[in-house]
Structure formats: C-alpha cells, structure tokens
C-alpha cells in the first residue's frame, strides 16, 4: 500500500473515512490544515476524518525497490540520468547566453563606430560650411517673386519658401571669376605658342589602324558602354555603363583597376579631373558623384550631389580642375566647387523654360560653356555671368555630344541627324556630315583629328573652314549592335578607344610591327 500523495510506503499510515484513500499522516495533516479538503477527490476534510492504521512496531516496512541491490542501482541510475540531463540543459543555456552577449557586444561596437563616423562627418560639414560663409561675398538683392533672374540664375518661386524650399546658391564669387579669367589668359597665351607634337600619329598611321583588343568590362545582363574618358598621363580608360557601374581600366596591363558602384541607374557621363585621382560620374538616377582613390587603391564616393530633379546627362571639368558643370533634363546646369561639392550656381535660361540639357562641354580656355538640348539647340554660355550669349540651330533631333577643338574656334556637335561643325568666330555652321544617329563626336588633344561614333566609327583630318575635311579611316562596329556610343583618342592619337552597346571596350591602333616602324620614323 502506498501513500496517495507521495507514492511511497507510509511510515505512519492513515486512511480517509470519506474516500478510503491511504496517506502518510504528516502529509495529509499538512494538506488538510492548508486547504481543508482531500487532495485527490477534493471533498471537504477535517483531521477527524482520518483514521490511523496500526502496524507492527518491531519491524518497519521498507520500500520494495530499495530492498535489494538491483533496486538501489536502478534508483542511482535514475538520479544520475536526471543529473546529467539537468547539467546538459544548463550548458545549453550557458552557450546561448554567451552567444547573445557576444552579439550584443558586436552591436554596441558597431553603433559606437557609426556614431563616431557621423560625428566626424558632421564636424567636417560644419567646417566646410564655415569656410564657405567666410568666402561668401555680400549678396545682392534678389527679387524673390521672379522665377529666374536676368543673369540666368534660378530665382525663388513663392511656392519654394519654407523648410522644403530649394537651397539658396552661393553664387560665383568675384574671387572665382578672377581665377577663371586668369586661367583663360594663361591658356590663351599657351595656345598661341603651342606646336603640333612630333609624336602625334600620322595620317598614314591612322589609315592602318585595326582592332588590337577587346575587353568585357560591364555586366552581360545590362550591356552597353554609354560614356568614356581617358586619363592620358596614366593611360587609364574610364567607362560608364548601362549596368549602373563605372569601370577604371589600365590599358597597358589590360587589367581593371576599380569598379565604381553606387548609382542606381545607368551612368550617362564620366570624366577624369585633370591628372588627379578624382573621377566624376553623372547618372539617370538624378545624381552626380565625386569619386576619390583611397590608400588601398579602391575608389570610393566622396560626394553624392542631388541638386538636379531629373536625369543628369553630362559632366564637364573646368581647365582649373577646381570646378565642374553638370547638365540635366530638368532644364538647368549647375556650377560646382570640386573640393567641397557645393553647387555655387544653378542656371536656367530665362527665355526658355522647357529646355532639356543633354550634353555639355567647357571651351579649352574655360570662360565659355557649350550645352546641347533635346530640342535640337546648341547654346553657348558666358560662365562669368551665366548668360546665354549664342544659340546654334539646324540640327534635327536631340543633341547627343559636343566637343571643342583645342585651336579654340571650332565646335563639333552630334545629333540624331548627323554632325555639324561651327566656327565660333562667326557663329556659323561651315560643314555638315550626314551620319544618322551620331552618338559621340570628339576632337583629339592636338585638334588635328575628329572622331565620330554612329553606326560605325569615322575619323577625319581636321582642316580650315574652307578646306575639305578628308576622311582618314572607317572603323567597323564589331559589337554587332550597330551602335557605337563613344569614341576617344589616346595620347598623341596612338590609339582610339571605342564603346558600344555591348559590354566591351575596344582598342584600335597600329599592329605591333607597324607601330615599331612608325615610332622609328618619328624618332
């Protein structure tokens, strides 16, 4: 007989009058004192309802399972198993607690790093703002009721007041204008003394150009090289792709130096900043990015500029390498300070509000800016006053590219109907090349050759206004897409780089044997 509460053989057995159940006396007394009812049936009980059962006092009863060695061993085994299971559960809980503590410590460390970085960026921004305020000249009175000022800068509409209003621009200060003017004077003097380099590739050499190499730089799911630039001092080629990335390619070694990721849409324009390690990119995501080379050789985005409200089509660097311009489909072009990334002026044409800028380039001397529009118009701007000083009409279709010659008075423009050459001295068109869907036009650095990218690549020998511009070479579009998007001349026109609507960068030049012979003749 076992106790109904403990399950053990009772030492002082008692039985309930009402339920007839057997209990250990001390246990049932305690339960009735606390609860006043039977622990099994729940009936009301008092101490008078339990009756002791008398047993022999000489021999005390023993539990059956402890009455033998096997029973004792079984009891010990059960207790050992329970102890091991409890120990295992504790170890699991300890391991989980350690993992949670480690994760919490990592999160705390990361949060401290983010806070430190944000504080550093905040302090740098405050310092730049303080420097800009110190350099800010006395602001002239602005008629806030006008949407555009007479000098071409954007005014402030009534609906732009308040916290969501557009940023007030610092303006191009007198110090900046002096710097641009001094640069113009110096470059103009240098141009008068400049000679065509003896190392320039000859016409005969260009006639022998053939494809030397092809390099797959961009992704296959979104192929297409939309823009390109060359850093002649290091022979590095930069390409902007439809796959949202820009690639820096070392031509001599045939290796990719860095892939610039950060834009969310295609890269529409890319430019090196002089001989520095800075790169500018414009994108259909409405932003311009300034990239710099870090100590490990990788490029990171130093500034992301969000001053435009529509696709940015072009960036062009001023000859000082301190300023640049971006042109957008939002009917404005912006003049930036390169070091701070600040937009000094955002300019629109007061006479034409619905104009979408699709191309832009600085004149080699830096005081003139050329812009192309989706409305087939080429506009010439005075950078100092931001005034539109000339317009060239005649194209049919969007202006896709513009290029100034280093001689200072020729301008080439490409559009969907072909390429036109303009004399800046007389502001007249003096020659037209009928190449449908011309995507890019480019003078070489000496002003001796003109490259045109359309369904193929054409190279012309530059001449005077009256003389004929003779074709030198036609390079086929080997991409199979029938659309060459960009063309650039290498140093001394020793090679031509071509981008197309596939993902490959193609290099055209002299075969090794002919190149060696041509170099010997030059020397």
From Swiss-Prot:
A single Pfam family, by name? Prp19
Which pathway does this polypeptide act in? Protein modification; protein ubiquitination
U-box domain ranges (all copies):
1-70
Q: Where is this region: Disordered?
A: 136-165
- Its Enzyme Commission number? 2.3.2.-
A Gene Ontology cellular component where this protein is annotated is: Prp19 complex
User: Does the record bear Nuclease in its keywords?
Assistant: no
Task: Read off the InterPro entries from this record.
Answer: Pre-mRNA_splic_Prp19_cc (IPR013915), Prp19 (IPR038959), RING-Ubox_PRP19 (IPR055340), Ubox_domain (IPR003613), WD40/YVTN_repeat-like_dom_sf (IPR015943), WD40_repeat_dom_sf (IPR036322), WD40_rpt (IPR001680), Znf_RING/FYVE/PHD (IPR013083)
What does this chain do?
A: Probable ubiquitin-protein ligase which is mainly involved pre-mRNA splicing and DNA repair. Component of the MAC complex that probably regulates defense responses through transcriptional control and thereby is essential for plant innate immunity.
Quaternary structure per UniProt? Homotetramer. Component of the multiprotein assembly MOS4-associated complex (MAC) at least composed of MOS4, CDC5, PRL1 and PRP19 which is related to the PRP19C/Prp19 complex/NTC/Nineteen complex identified in other organisms. Associated with the spliceosome.
Tell me what this protein is called.
Pre-mRNA-processing factor 19 homolog 1
High-level lineage? Eukaryota, Viridiplantae, Streptophyta, Embryophyta, Tracheophyta
């Amino acid at each position: 007989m076992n106790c109904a509460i403990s399950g053990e053989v009772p030492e002082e057995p008692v039985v309930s009058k009402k339920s007839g159940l057997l209990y250990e006396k001390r246990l049932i007394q305690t339960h009735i004192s606390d609860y006043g009812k039977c622990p099994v049936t729940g009936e009301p009980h008092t101490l008078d309802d339990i009756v002791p059962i008398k047993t022999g006092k000489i021999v005390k009863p023993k539990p059956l399972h402890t009455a033998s060695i096997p029973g004792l061993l079984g009891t010990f085994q059960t207790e050992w198993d329970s102890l091991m299971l409890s120990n295992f559960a504790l170890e699991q809980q300890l391991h989980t607690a350690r993992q949670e503590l480690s994760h919490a410590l990592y999160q705390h460390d990361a949060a401290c790093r983010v806070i430190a970085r944000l504080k550093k960026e905040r302090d740098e921004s405050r310092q730049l703002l303080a420097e800009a305020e110190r350099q800010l000249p006395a602001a002239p009175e602005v008629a806030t009721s006008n949407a555009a000022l007479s000098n071409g800068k954007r005014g402030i509409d009534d609906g732009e007041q308040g916290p969501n209003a557009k940023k007030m621009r610092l303006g191009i200060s007198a110090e900046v204008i002096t710097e641009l003017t001094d640069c113009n004077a110096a470059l103009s003097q240098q141009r008068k003394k400049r000679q065509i380099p003896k190392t320039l590739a000859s016409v005969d050499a260009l006639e022998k150009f053939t494809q030397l190499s092809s390099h797959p730089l961009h992704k296959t799911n979104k192929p297409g090289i939309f823009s390109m630039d060359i850093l002649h001092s290091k022979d590095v080629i930069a390409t902007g792709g439809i796959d949202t990335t820009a690639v820096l390619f070392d031509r001599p070694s045939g290796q990719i130096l860095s892939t610039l990721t950060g834009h969310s849409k295609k890269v529409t324009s890319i430019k090196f900043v002089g001989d520095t390690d800075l790169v500018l990119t414009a994108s259909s995501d409405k932003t311009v990015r300034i990239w710099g080379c870090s100590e490990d050789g990788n490029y990171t985005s130093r500034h992301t500029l969000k001053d435009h409200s529509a696709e940015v089509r072009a960036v062009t660097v001023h000859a000082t390498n301190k300023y640049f311009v971006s042109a957008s489909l939002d009917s404005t072009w912006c003049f930036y300070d390169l070091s701070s990334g600040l937009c000094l002026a955002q300019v629109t044409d007061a006479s034409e509000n619905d104009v979408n800028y699709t191309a832009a380039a600085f004149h080699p001397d830096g005081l003139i800016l050329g812009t192309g529009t989706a409305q087939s118009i080429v506009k010439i701007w005075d950078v100092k006053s931001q005034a539109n000083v000339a317009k060239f009409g005649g194209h049919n279709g969007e202006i896709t590219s513009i290029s100034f010659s280093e001689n200072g008075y020729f301008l080439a423009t490409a559009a969907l109907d072909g390429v036109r050459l303009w004399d800046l001295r007389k502001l007249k068109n003096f020659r037209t090349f009928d190449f449908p869907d011309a995507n890019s036009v480019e003078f070489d650095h000496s002003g001796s050759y003109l490259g045109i990218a359309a369904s193929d690549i054409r190279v012309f020998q530059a001449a005077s206004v009256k003389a004929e511009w003779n074709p030198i070479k036609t390079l086929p579009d080997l991409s199979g897409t029938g659309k060459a998007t960009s063309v650039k001349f290498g140093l001394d026109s020793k090679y031509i780089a071509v981008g197309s609507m596939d993902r490959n960068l193609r290099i055209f030049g002299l075969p090794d044997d002919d190149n060696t012979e041509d170099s010997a003749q030059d020397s």
